[in-house]
C-alpha cells in the first residue's frame, strides 16, 4: 500500500488534507526557502527542495508531496512570509485595493522508482480598499505573521478580500483539485475513493 508523505510544517496544509480524509504522515522539511524574481521558479524550487528533503526520511512505498506558496504583485514582486508587524503592514498597504497573484508549486515524487510530477497553480486575488482602522485591527490579531502575503484567507484575512479568480484552496496553500487529479492519474492514489471508503466503513461500524 502506498503511503502519502506531506513534506510541510504548515498547519494550514496539514489541516486541509485531514479534512479531505487523507491518510498521510508529515515530515517537516529543514530547508532554507529561496526567493527569486520569478514566482514560478521560486515555488517550484522550494517545493522540489522540500520533497527531496523528506525523501531521505520517508518509508518505502512513499509518495512525497512538497509544496510552496508565494504572493506576487507588480509593485512588490515576489512576496514571502512577513516576520514582523512592520513588514506585514507595509505589504498589506501595497496590496490594498489591488489585484495580486497567488502561486503554489507542487512537486510529487515516488520513493520506490523516483518517478515525479510537478505543476504550478495560479489564483488571482483582489483585496478590498479596506480602511486604516481595519488594517490596524487585522495586524493586531498577529494572524499576518508568517503567512504568505501577510494574510490568511481561511481566517480573518477573508474579510480583506473582494474577489477571487481560480482555486480558493490554492490561496490556502494546496491546489486541491489539481493535486487530486495528478495523484490519481500518475501515482494511482485516489483521494476521493479513499475518503468515501473511510466514511462508509465509519458509518457501518456505528450501526
From Swiss-Prot:
Pfam families reported for this sequence: Maf
Main location: cytoplasm
GO cellular component: cytoplasm
Cofactor: a divalent metal cation
InterPro entries linked to this entry: ITPase-like_fam (IPR029001), Maf-like (IPR003697)
Active site per the UniProt annotation: 68 (proton acceptor)
Signal peptide limits: none
Cellular localisation: Cytoplasm
Root EC class: hydrolase
Record's catalysed reaction(s): dTTP + H2O = dTMP + diphosphate + H(+); UTP + H2O = UMP + diphosphate + H(+)
Site (described: Important for substrate specificity): 12, 69, 154
This protein's UniProt keywords: Cytoplasm, Hydrolase, Nucleotide metabolism
Similarity section: Belongs to the Maf family. YhdE subfamily.
NCBIfam families named among the record's database cross-references: maf (TIGR00172)
Name used for this protein in its record: dTTP/UTP pyrophosphatase
Species the sequence originates in: Staphylothermus marinus (strain ATCC 43588 / DSM 3639 / JCM 9404 / F1)
Organism ancestry: Archaea, Thermoproteota, Thermoprotei, Desulfurococcales, Desulfurococcaceae
